Amino acid sequence: MFKTHKVEIEWAGRPLTIETGRVARQADGAVVATYGETVVLATVVSAKAPKPDQDFFPLTVNYQEKTYAVGKIPGGYFKRESRPSENETLISRLIDRPIRPLFVDDYKNDTQVIVSVIQHDLENNPDILSMIAASAALTLSGIPFMGPIAGARVGYCNGHYVLNPTLDEMPESKLDLVVAGTENAVLMVESEAHELSEEVMLGAITFGQKGFQPVIDAIIQLAEVAAKEPREFIPEDFSDLEKTMLKMIEKDLRKAYTITDKQQRYDAIDAIKTEILSKFAPEMEVNCELTADKIATVFKRLQAKIVRWNILDTGKRIDGRDLSTVRPIQSEVGILPRTHGSALFTRGETQALVVATLGTSEDEQYVDLLTGVCKETFLLHYNFPPFSVGETGRLSSPGRREIGHGKLAWRAIHPMLPTKEAFPYTIRVVSEITESNGSSSMATVCGTSLALMDAGVPLARPVAGIAMGLIKEGERFVILSDILGDEDHLGDMDFKVAGTKNGITSLQMDIKIDGITEDIMKIALEQAKDGRNHILNEMAKALTDARTELSEFSPRIEMMTIPVEKIREVIGSGGKVIREIVEQTGAKINIEDDGTIKIASPDTKSIETAKSWIHSIVDEPEVGTIYQGTVVKTTEFGAFINFFGSHDGLVHISQLASKRVAKTTDVVKEGDKVWVQLMGFDERGKIRLSMKVVDQQTGKEIPQDDLIKTEKEQNPDEKNKSEKKRHNRKKED
């Protein structure tokens, strides 16, 4: 019934199996891939023809994690998987980016890749396996895909690269780098690093590319026996139309691309496009094969060619800069003084308004992954409203691009954050892109660094980011620093690098062509380092270090630790005690299972009150220490005082005051607040207290000499009796 084909290799110490022909046989391509005991199903289906007037390639990649893969039932009311999580969206992008450039030019058939995680061994991350499975399914499908590609994860532990580290090994790694590419070229890199050098990062890319070669060989081996016949696809020839249009618009288009203002430049280009359409209008009426869409397609190609020729021939860019110059930078902090931290970072025509907010453990985000639920204390949200590029548009929930750009900035900042113990706050950063002309994600990195320091978050070092570009024609190439939007769209590479003065914290690279050599990447990294250091120097004009004091509007959090066995006493029966502390002090209190307590409040006094209250519950009173207490009962022989939480002790009538006391109620009454010193314990372990040794106004201990003097002054009868006794003893002698 099944005609299955399978290849199996040993890869990084674990078996990798790619199988086709058993599952999802009606898809154009379907693969079940297994790595260790993690299993994914990848399918691809492409329409037989493009939709009419389709002017782009509609590729959709959906990555989905099934909870049954780890023996779980989904939460929520409906108990089924719903909209993609942030993690699923990010992995969908991770798969999309290296495969998209490999579809043949002008292929516009609706294409969908679906990758499902159907088993997870909690050891091998399914993202790399999903990329491999998608590549294999495309290679087998007969769709015009110039693959295969493969990917690998690279770690860096103890000065050595590690291929495909397991989930347990990743916390020890200073690098989390994913690289994907073909047999001969790197197409995509994404990473988070702990201030690693350019040499280490480049070495990791090369190490990863070599590491995934056996996988490409395995996919080719499977395709030789299981691939479908290639679909016939002949790209439309626009060469004659291109030559004709180039003669008509080259001069005007070159002139338009010397206009430095983005909106003015776009207006000039739109005018040229409108004019060329009007010139071809008579011909379009008689030639049904010549359409406005074809003219628009050729016009876009000519735009790319002219921009590229200008840069390669003159070394000058669209806005007049040379190849390595960064646009003018303006950094401002504290522009929204009632927020916890804020910054406005402007670089040329790209601008980010970034705001940091500090919260408590109640604000932590719970992230439900296949590997378990974790709590995220650093959130970074990137928003790209349509007005930032002078357009109208629909405002909705964040799209894939916004989620991806936010995560890129998150990776850049995350290694520089203080530990949870050193800074026990939940941090949320929102980056509002208010203007955009390229590199908005890197503006977010710079703005986030400034906003966090303005909020008083003690970053290890400031972080900056820069986007690099590439124009390559044959053997000629140039590397561009701080690329514009047009240079991104019309160039061959988008290479984003973020880091500190000490090294790289995040790197993301997307390459649209083959032939990017190690030397080109090395030049790009070195040029990016110079640009990054320049940006850091410009940022330092606004703020160099984190503010030493938090905003007056920020919550204050203090931590204390109690013995685990005392947690029950602090919480109380049914939470009675902890609720009373919260209600009386106004502080928020969070108790961890290990005995760590976080106390949060905008008011320092309420924090101190809550801390003292908790100390009174878990600590034992010490002899010689002064405490404030409440009189709970009076008797003929003294008063009982409740102090230091639930502790009770007796102040004997002789210890109520320095003078002789006839009745206890002459000095204290029930409900009075008094200061007492713990004198010790009687033979039955009962607490002995004294009021007379403490100044009841200040709560300070009275010096012994002063106490004796006061007693003599306030008890003259007792003094006379003592002198009479001494006189009688002398007479007897």
UniProtKB/Swiss-Prot annotation:
Q: Which InterPro entries match?
A: ExoRNase_PH_dom1, ExoRNase_PH_dom2, ExoRNase_PH_dom2_sf, KH_dom, KH_dom_type_1, KH_dom_type_1_sf, NA-bd_OB-fold, PNPase
In which compartments does the protein localize? Cytoplasm
Q: What EC number(s) would the UniProt record show? A: 2.7.7.8
Q: Which UniProt keywords apply?
A: Cytoplasm, Magnesium, Metal-binding, Nucleotidyltransferase, RNA-binding, Transferase
Q: Where is the composition biased (Basic residues)?
A: 722-733
Could you say which residues bind Mg(2+) here? D488, D494
Q: Which SUPFAM superfamilies match?
A: Eukaryotic type KH-domain (KH-domain type I), Nucleic acid-binding proteins, Ribonuclease PH domain 2-like, Ribosomal protein S5 domain 2-like
Mind telling me which PROSITE patterns this protein's record contains? Answer: KH_TYPE_1, S1
Tell me where it mainly resides. Answer: cytoplasm
- Which Gene3D superfamilies does the protein's record reference? GHMP Kinase, N-terminal domain, K Homology domain, type 1, Nucleic acid-binding proteins
- Locate the S1 motif domain: which residues? 624-692
UniProt-annotated stretches for the region Disordered = 698-733
One GO BP:
mRNA catabolic process
Q: Where is the KH domain?
A: 555-614
Q: Where is the composition biased (Basic and acidic residues)?
A: 702-721
Tell me, what does this protein do in biology? Involved in mRNA degradation. Catalyzes the phosphorolysis of single-stranded polyribonucleotides processively in the 3'- to 5'-direction.
Family that this chain belongs to: Belongs to the polyribonucleotide nucleotidyltransferase family.
Matching entries from HAMAP family are given as:
PNPase (MF_01595)
Q: What is this protein called?
A: Polyribonucleotide nucleotidyltransferase
Q: Please tell me the species this chain comes from.
A: Bartonella bacilliformis (strain ATCC 35685 / KC583 / Herrer 020/F12,63)
